[in-house]
């Protein structure tokens, strides 16, 4: 059975990842590290879930390093917004810096599988700041040399966020409407948060078992159609 550590558990995708992990019989223990208590913690079995809550993110890596037993899978759904961070430079420092720092701590602790929720279009050569940042995160964590790295690149993420993002909410409404007409209209460019979460957990567990596609033994990248396939309800 897997022991899993998770950052980003209070976000839209991360919250669904946590719920999926708690429901999975293949997962023995879940440790979350976050700024606030994940909503799912209120009803989670204490024997399976341990939460570490601190606004001081400089404490997160040492907390991850000290986890016993060592997580066999480390998952990151952590991210922030330009507005919340106070500009893109700060967003980069927080999102890129913390993701890479935590991945390195997990690698050094002996974690075998790393799972990252990235973004469609992520590329360090992108002309746009956000996908370029996502691409740089991907490249930097791949360079750490986990036994297996799993990267999910969803398109627009459909679902309910706690924070207000009016423009994104409008596009999510269009995606939802398109999905009601025909699911294929949406699935190519938008995926539901719970589907992404299930795909992340399923892919992480498969990677731990060594059950990955040929040619993806070290790095396995899942895009829209893969996410839909692995995120389906069993």
From Swiss-Prot:
Cytoplasm recorded as keyword: no
Name the InterPro entries for this protein.
NAD(P)-bd_dom (IPR016040), NAD(P)-bd_dom_sf (IPR036291)
Where does it sit, as one GO cellular component term?
mitochondrial outer membrane
Biological process, per Gene Ontology: import into nucleus
Highest taxon of source: Eukaryota
A Pfam family in this protein?
Answer: NAD_binding_10
Q: How does it sit in the membrane?
A: Peripheral membrane protein
Kindly list the places in or outside the cell where this protein is found, as annotated in its UniProt entry: Mitochondrion outer membrane
Primary localization class, coarse: mitochondrion
Per UniProt, the keywords (alphabetical) are: Membrane, Mitochondrion, Mitochondrion outer membrane, Transit peptide
| Family in the record | Belongs to the FMP52 family.
Q: What is this protein called?
A: Protein fmp52, mitochondrial
Q: From which organism does this entry originate? A: Aspergillus clavatus (strain ATCC 1007 / CBS 513.65 / DSM 816 / NCTC 3887 / NRRL 1 / QM 1276 / 107)
């Amino acid at each position: 059975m897997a022991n899993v550590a998770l950052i980003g558990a209070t976000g839209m995708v991360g919250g669904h990842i946590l719920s999926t992990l708690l429901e999975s019989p293949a997962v023995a223990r879940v440790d979350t590290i976050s700024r606030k208590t994940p909503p799912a913690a209120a009803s989670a079995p204490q024997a399976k879930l341990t939460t570490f809550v601190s606004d001081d993110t400089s404490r997160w890596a040492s907390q991850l390093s000290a986890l016993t037993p060592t997580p066999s899978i480390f998952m990151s759904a952590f991210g922030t917004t330009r507005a919340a961070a106070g500009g893109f430079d700060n967003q980069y420092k927080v999102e890129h810096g913390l993701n890479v720092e935590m991945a390195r701590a997990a690698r050094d602790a002996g974690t075998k599988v790393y799972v990252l929720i990235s973004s469609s279009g992520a590329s360090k050569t992108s002309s746009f700041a956000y996908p370029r940042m996502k691409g740089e995160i991907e490249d930097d964590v791949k360079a750490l040399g986990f036994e297996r790295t799993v990267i999910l690149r969803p398109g627009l993420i459909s679902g309910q966020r706690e924070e207000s993002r009016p423009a994104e909410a409008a596009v999510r409404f269009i995606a939802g409407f398109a999905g009601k007409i025909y699911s294929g209209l949406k699935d190519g460019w938008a995926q539901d948060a719970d589907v992404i979460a299930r795909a992340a957990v399923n892919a992480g567990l498969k990677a731990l078992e060594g059950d990955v596609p040929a040619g993806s033994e070290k790095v396995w990248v899942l895009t829209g159609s893969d996410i839909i396939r692995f995120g389906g309800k069993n």
